[in-house]
Amino acid sequence: MVSWIDGGVCAAQGFRAAGLHVGVKTHNVNKKDVALIVSDADCAAAAVFTTNVVKAAPIHVTKAHLANGRARAVVANSGNANACAPLGEENAKRMCAAAAKAIGCGAEDVLVCSTGVIGQTLRVNVIEEGMEELASLLERSGAASDAAAHAIMTTDTVKKEAAVETTVGGKTVRIGGIAKGSGMIHPNMGTMLCFITTDCAISPEMIREALVDTAHVSFNRISVDGDTSTNDTCLVLANGLAGNETITGEGEDYAAFLEALKALCVRLARMMAKDGEGARHLITCTVAGAKDEESAQTIAKSVISSTLTKAAIFGCDANWGRVLCAMGYSGEEFDPDKVDVAFASAAGEIPVCRQGRGLDFDEDLAKRILTEDEVEIRVRMGEGDAACTCWGCDITYDYIKINGDYRT
């Protein structure tokens, strides 16, 4: 059984965190811009990265440091992507070296991430100068997780953190995470930053398998704006301090751990979709009756990624034709004459399309349903028994404003 707990990225035994303003963000000294997460013990570690061909320097460094499947710490900055910029990998390595010196481990045991403006040289010297102070703030507390969560935010309006507890092999295991993501988010992994910590004892091979499986059903099922970033990374550290027998293969223990990890990541993914830049609505699209799960996911992704559908939800307009249109260009084969569509929220549910044809419906009720903060598009395909749920958000005037002056 999975239970929700407090503590965020510090919920698991042996993990400490900190966040501090060191000067990467020059426009606001009150905004933290560097985060540090450290384990008291060596960790099995894994990560999944952006599929964008243009990858930021920290991704190359982190991939190299993960070659042995082990790590001790994560250092991350916001305000500068360290992508397509001079001395990118050198500066990423300098961040790792500074963190390693401050906490007492090898530079290759530190994973590094960046997020922010692309194409500008990272002021790595201010990170180096602030690292000792940042390390001095490390502690295992909810406040420390909160500080780290805020330190990786860019256009986010709220922090994203969560933690769960479960039982693995008779031992209490905790998993916590922090994430950032508000724009440049599209389901294709990776599409954000997410740092996960756990005290579960699990091999590097199995923690990677669990992360890949989990990303597929969580972060790969969200979309804000259709853009896949150059930097985005989801990583996990597992230090084994829970004391369970090390998971080295599939079985009951692995299934229990995987269930908890998926629950955590789905919650974080929903937080990111809900906090899309300028968004007013969280959109859930559930496609049922598909021929298989992959088909259902492709169609649901297409619907939540549709700019016209997003605009309709922003306007509280039950324009179901845009849903069918997005389904039709998804690349999946299906019979439109079998499709049913309904809109739902806390205010109720209203069918708007049956067997590919529009229904007469109460426009006022539909508007009330779509006025809620969280709305659902329910699609039935009539092609099989498979289903999938994806998450997105509406598009508003504020999205244009935020991104029109992002660099200023």
Model-derived segments and spans:
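A structural signal for small-residue-enriched, beta-sheet-centric alpha/beta enzyme cores
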Residues: 1-90, 94, 100-408
